[in-house]
């Protein structure tokens, strides 16, 4: 079950919404938050990959030779935004185990709300034959996600999909303003941002809740 508006797909499946309710709950402990984040990401990945191109191949079943469909081109690249995006990585890899993995290190300056890049390590994308999934739990102001998408595009990805747990309208507008061709897949679009740039109602600081820091 999904709702799609202007390049944003909100996955409304009951399992996603049920698990999201516990991610939002401030009393959910770190160990459960971490597990739930991976499970929701797994379910979002199913939707995020639905338009990947396929090509025919042939295999031998125990009974006969038959034609099958396989994802076309090179293996997908999964690129979590450090550090919080790491909490989503296993959810994707549980479905797309052959994916290549890249890392984009960004943190948000809490005064300017602008992203600061400190590390980028991506798989080979320069041939334009590899689709990329960027993982960023919270699409808040959209600046960090936009910077991560820009890095992946610059490296040569064929297409880019952003998967996030929760998005704010402000973040969606900013990302689409800079990267109109990027599809966004999320479990929810929330009301907006508070004066500190946090999504409300949101689920708090995803990185802190994943790793038990403050």
Task: Give the location of each predicted region.
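PRPP-associated nucleotide enzymes
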Residues: 1-214
């Amino acid at each position: 079950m999904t709702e799609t508006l202007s390049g944003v797909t909100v996955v409304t499946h009951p399992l996603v919404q049920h698990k999201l309710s516990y991610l939002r709950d401030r009393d959910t402990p770190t160990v459960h938050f971490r597990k739930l984040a991976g499970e929701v990401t797994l379910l979002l990945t199913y939707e995020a990959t639905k338009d990947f191109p396929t090509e025919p191949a042939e295999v031998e079943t125990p009974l006969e030779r038959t034609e099958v469909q396989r994802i076309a081109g090179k293996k997908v690249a999964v690129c979590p935004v450090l550090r919080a995006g790491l909490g989503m990585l296993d959810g994707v890899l549980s479905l797309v185990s052959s994916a290549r993995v890249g890392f984009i290190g960004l943190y948000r300056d809490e005064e300017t709300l602008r992203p600061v890049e400190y590390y980028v390590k991506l798989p080979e994308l320069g041939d334009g034959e590899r689709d990329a999934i960027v993982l960023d739990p919270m699409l808040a102001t959209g600046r960090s996600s936009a910077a991560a998408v820009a890095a992946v595009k610059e490296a040569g990805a064929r297409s880019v999909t952003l998967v996030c747990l929760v998005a704010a309208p402000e973040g969606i507008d900013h990302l689409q303003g800079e990267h109109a061709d990027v599809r966004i897949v999320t479990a929810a679009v929330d009301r907006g941002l508070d004066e500190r740039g946090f999504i409300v109602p949101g689920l708090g600081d995803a990185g802190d809740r994943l790793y038990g820091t403050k």
